[in-house]
C-alpha cells in the first residue's frame, strides 16, 4: 500500500516551497538536509507531504517520549490508512547495573517494564517486516540493542485454514517463539490448547486467535479478549515472536562455548595481575548466569551476553531498530499469499519465512525532529554507557563482551540511517554545516506572528494593583494566570528545578488554580495524559522544567511564563529561550513573560530573533491580506490512539474498587464461610512471602483486609427502626 495523506488543509505560506525543496533534495540523492522552520509553521505537515511524495518507509526520531507520542498521533491523523507506530523505551523505571569503587558499592540492575509500551514496540518491528508503508516515531531508544532481525524473521509463523497441521511441531514452534503455554487466563505472548482448540494471544494485539484443528486447520477466528465474542473468521494468520531476543538451540550452544572461552581468558588475566577478589567474583557470576540461562532461559543482565548470542565479533555494534528498517521489504502481509517467498517446513505443516527473503537496501527516510537537542542526545549515549561498563569489567562484575551491549556510536548511527532531514527552529552549527541544503519555513499559513515578549523585573508594582505593594514574580504570575483562565486559555510556566515546579504547583492549587506539573520523574503514559488534560481544560496551568521547551503543540496556550529568566545556563540559553517562547506561537493572543532583574546576552539575542520573525510574518500578512487566527487542532486521546488504557496512577479508592471486583470474581462458586476463606488466603500469603513472591503476598494481604472488613460489617448490629 502507498502512503496516502489525508488532510482538509493544503500547503500554504512557506510550506509549498519547503516541500518542493526537500523532495528535490531527496530525489537528487542528498544525504542530509535541514528544514529550518519556526514554531507553528506546520513542519510536521510539511514532512507528511514529503513522505507522501517520496513514498519511503520513514523513521522519525524525537528527543523525549512525550514529543514522540504527540508526533505519532499527528502522523496517524495524516496517514490513517498506513502503519504509524510508536517506539520508545519500555521501562517505567530503570536503574542500570553499576559499581562505585570509591565506596565499594555495587548496584544491581533494577527495571520495571511497561507491558503496554512493549506491545507498541512489537507492533513497530512487525509492521516493518510486513509492509512498506510504515512510519515509526521513536525516541533515542532506536539506537539501543533489539535483537537480530534475521533470527526474528526466521521463525515468523504463517498458519492457513485448510493446511495440514502437526500439533506437536506447532507447540514446539510456539515455544521457540518465546510464547508461554498456560492452562489458565491468556495474557500477551501466551497460548493454550484445550482439546482440538488452540487459543493464541499475540504480543502486539489485545485479541485472541482461536484455531480449531483436527488433522488440518478447520477454522481461524479472531476473538475479543474480554467478551470472547468472535469478531470475524480469517483465512490465515501471521504470528511473530513474543520477544525480540530470539535464539535457536544451536546458537545458544555456540554462545555458551564462546562465553566459557572468554571467561577462561579473563580469569587468566586476573590471575596474572593477582586480582583474587575479581577472579572469584567473575567466576561465580558467570557460572551462576549460565546455569540460570540453561535451566530457565534467562538471567538478570542476560543482555550483557548479547554479543555471543547474536554471533557478533568484538566491538561490532548491536542490532537495533535501524537494522529492522534496513532488513524490511514489506511483503509478508500484502504479497505473501501470491508470492513464492514462503517455504513449508517438511512434514510439520508449518509455513515459515525463508531466510533472506525479506532483505532489501536501507532505502528509508530519517527525520530528526528538534535536531538541535536530539543529535547531541544520540551522540552522548555511547560514552556514558562505556564508562559504566569499563568499571564493571575492571572489577570482575562482567566479562569484557558486556561492553558490546551498548547503544550505537554516532558514526554507526549515521552509517545505518537513510537520507536524513534535520528539523528545528534553531538548528546548531553541526546541522547547518553537514546539510547539503537548508530549507527555510518562516512564514506561517495561519498568519500567526511570534508572541509578544515582555520582560518583567522579579519585583515591581503591577499595573492592575491600586496599592504600592511590590509583587514577587509568583504573585504577578497568578494575576496573569487568572486573566487567561477567564478567557478560556491555558498557561505554561517553566522553572529551574523539579522541586520548584512541584512547590509552585502546590502553591497555585492552594490559590484555587487548576495546575499540574510535568518533569522527568513522571511516567511516560502519565505525561501524555497530563498534556491531553491541559488541552481539554481539565487543568489550566502546566508547570515544568525542561520538558516544555521543544515541540509540544498546544494551540490553547496563550501565555508562557519563564521564571528566573536571567539565570544564564543550559535552561536559559538563547536556543532554550527561543524554543520556550515558541510554545505561545500557536495562539493569536500569545504572550511570553520573562521574569528577570538583568538582561542577559541570551535573553537579548532571543528577543531580537523573535522580533525579526515577527516582522517577517507581519509583512507577509499585510502583503496577502491575512488576518492571524489561532491554530485549530483536534484534541484526540493519544493513549486511546495507541490502544493503551487511559489512566494515571491509580488512587487508593480505585485500587480498592479493583480489588473488590477481583475478589467477587475469585469467590464465584466458593460457598465457604468468609472466616474459612480468610484462613486459606492467610496460608497462601505466608507461602508467597516464604517463596519471596512479595507482590503476590501483598495482593493476598489486601484481599484479606477486604474480607475482614466484610466480616466486621456483617457482625454489626442492625439499628432498630423507630416507630
Where do the protein language model's features map onto the residues?
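Conserved helicase motor "Helicase C" RecA-like lobe of SF1/SF2 P-loop NTPases
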Residues: 150-154, 495-519, 706, 710
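Conserved pre-motif I regulatory segment
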Residues: 1-36
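Walker A/P-loop
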Residues: 28-50
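Conserved strand-helix element at the start of the C-terminal RecA-like helicase core
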Residues: 57-69, 86, 275-278, 484-506
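A cross-taxon signal for low-complexity, glycine/charged-rich
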Residues: 336-350, 354-360, 653, 657
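N-terminal cationic and glycine-rich segments that engage phosphates or anionic surfaces
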Residues: 34, 87-136, 140-328, 362-486, ...
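Conserved RecA-like helicase motor-core motifs
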Residues: 80-89, 301, 454, 489-492, ...
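Conserved helicase ATPase core of P-loop NTP-dependent helicases/translocases
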Residues: 522-544
Amino acid at each position: 500500500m502507498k502512503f496516502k495523506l489525508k488532510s482538509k488543509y493544503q500547503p500554504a505560506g512557506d510550506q509549498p516551497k519547503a516541500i518542493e525543496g526537500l523532495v528535490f533534495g531527496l530525489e537528487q540523492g542528498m544525504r542530509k538536509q535541514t528544514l529550518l522552520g519556526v514554531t507553528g509553521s506546520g513542519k510536521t505537515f510539511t514532512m507528511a507531504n514529503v513522505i507522501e511524495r517520496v513514498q519511503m518507509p520513514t523513521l522519525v526520531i524525537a528527543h523525549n517520549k512525550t514529543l514522540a507520542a504527540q508526533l505519532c498521533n499527528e502522523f496517524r491523523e495524516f496517514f490513517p490508512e498506513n502503519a504509524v507506530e510508536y517506539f520508545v523505551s519500555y521501562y517505567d523505571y530503570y536503574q542500570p547495573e553499576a559499581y562505585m569503587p570509591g565506596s565499594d558499592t555495587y548496584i544491581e540492575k533494577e527495571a520495571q517494564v511497561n507491558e503496554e509500551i512493549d506491545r507498541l514496540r512489537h507492533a513497530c518491528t512487525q509492521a516493518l517486516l510486513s509492509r512498506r508503508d510504515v512510519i515509526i516515531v521513536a525516541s533515542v531508544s532506536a539506537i539501543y540493542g533489539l535483537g537480530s532481525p534475521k533470527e526474528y524473521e526466521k521463525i515468523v509463523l504463517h498458519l492457513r485454514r485448510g493446511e495440514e497441521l502437526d500439533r506437536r511441531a506447532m507447540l514446539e514452534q510456539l515455544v521457540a517463539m518465546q510464547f508461554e503455554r498456560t492452562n489458565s487466563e491468556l495474557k500477551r505472548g501466551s497460548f493454550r490448547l484445550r482439546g482440538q482448540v488452540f487459543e493464541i494471544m499475540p504480543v502486539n494485539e489485545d485479541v485472541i486467535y482461536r484455531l480449531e484443528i483436527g488433522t488440518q486447520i478447520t477454522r481461524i477466528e479472531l476473538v475479543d479478549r474480554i467478551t470472547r465474542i468472535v469478531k470475524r473468521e480469517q483465512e490465515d494468520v501471521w504470528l511473530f515472536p513474543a520477544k525480540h531476543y530470539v535464539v535457536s538451540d544451536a546458537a545458544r550452544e555456540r554462545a555458551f562455548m564462546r562465553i566459557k572461552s572468554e571467561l577462561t581468558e579473563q580469569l587468566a588475566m586476573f590471575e596474572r595481575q593477582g586480582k583474587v577478589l575479581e577472579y572469584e567474583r567473575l567466576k561465580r557470576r558467570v557460572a551462576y548466569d549460565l546455569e540460570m540461562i540453561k535451566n530457565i532461559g534467562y538471567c538478570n543482565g542476560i543482555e550483557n551476553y548479547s554479543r555471543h548470542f547474536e554471533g557478533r565479533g568484538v566491538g561490532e555494534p548491536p542490532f537495533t531498530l535501524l537494522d529492522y528498517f534496513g532488513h524490511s521489504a514489506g511483503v509478508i502481509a500484502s504479497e505473501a499469499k501470491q508470492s513464492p517467498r514462503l517455504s513449508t517446513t517438511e512434514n510439520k505443516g508449518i509455513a515459515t519465512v525463508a531466510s533472506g527473503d525479506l532483505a532489501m537496501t536501507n532505502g528509508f527516510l530519517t527525520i530528526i525532529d528538534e535536531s538541535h537537542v536530539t543529535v547531541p542526545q544520540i551522540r552522548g549515549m555511547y560514552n556514558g554507557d562505556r564508562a559504566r561498563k569499563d568499571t564493571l569489567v575492571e572489577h570482575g562484575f562482567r566479562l569484557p563482551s558486556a561492553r558490546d551491549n551498548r547503544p550505537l556510536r554516532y558514526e554507526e548511527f549515521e552509517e545505518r540511517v537513510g537520507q536524513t532531514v534535520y528539523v528545528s527552529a534553531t538548528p546548531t552549527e553541526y546541522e547547518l554545516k553537514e546539510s547539503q541544503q537548508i530549507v527555510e519555513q518562516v512564514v506561517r499559513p495561519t498568519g500567526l506572528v511570534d508572541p509578544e515578549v515582555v520582560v518583567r523585573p522579579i519585583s515591581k508594582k503591577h499595573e492592575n494593583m491600586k496599592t504600592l505593594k511590590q509583587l514577587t514574580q509568583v504573585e504577578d504570575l497568578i494575576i496573569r494566570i487568572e486573566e487567561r483562565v477567564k478567557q478560556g486559555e491555558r498557561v505554561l510556566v517553566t522553572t529551574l528545578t523539579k522541586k520548584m515546579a512541584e512547590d509552585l504547583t502546590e502553591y497555585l492549587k492552594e490559590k484555587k488554580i487548576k495546575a499540574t506539573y510535568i518533569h522527568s520523574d513522571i511516567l511516560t503514559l502519565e505525561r501524555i495524559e497530563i498534556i491531553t488534560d491541559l488541552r481539554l481544560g481539565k487543568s489550566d496551568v502546566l508547570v515544568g522544567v525542561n520538558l516544555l521547551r521543544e515541540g509540544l503543540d498546544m494551540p490553547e496556550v496563550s501565555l508562557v511564563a519563564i521564571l528566573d529568566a536571567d539565570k544564564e545556563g543550559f535552561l536559559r540559553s538563547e536556543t532554550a529561550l527561543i524554543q520556550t517562547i515558541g510554545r505561545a506561537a500557536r495562539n493569536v493572543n500569545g504572550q511570553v513573560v520573562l521574569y528577570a532583574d538583568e538582561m542577559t546576552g541570551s535573553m537579548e539575542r532571543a528577543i531580537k530573533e523573535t522580533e525579526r520573525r515577527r516582522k517577517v510574518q507581519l509583512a507577509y500578512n499585510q502583503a496577502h491580506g491575512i488576518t492571524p487566527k489561532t491554530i485549530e487542532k483536534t484534541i484526540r486521546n493519544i493513549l486511546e490512539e495507541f490502544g493503551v488504557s487511559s489512566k494515571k496512577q491509580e488512587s487508593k479508592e480505585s485500587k480498592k474498587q479493583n480489588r473488590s471486583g477481583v475478589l467477587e470474581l475469585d469467590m464465584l462458586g466458593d460457598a465457604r464461610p468468609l472466616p474459612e476463606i480468610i484462613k486459606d488466603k492467610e496460608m497462601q500469603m505466608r507461602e508467597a512471602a516464604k517463596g519471596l513472591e512479595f507482590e503476590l503476598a501483598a495482593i493476598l494481604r489486601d484481599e484479606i483486609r477486604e474480607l475482614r472488613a466484610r466480616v466486621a460489617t456483617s457482625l454489626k448490629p442492625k439499628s432498630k427502626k423507630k416507630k
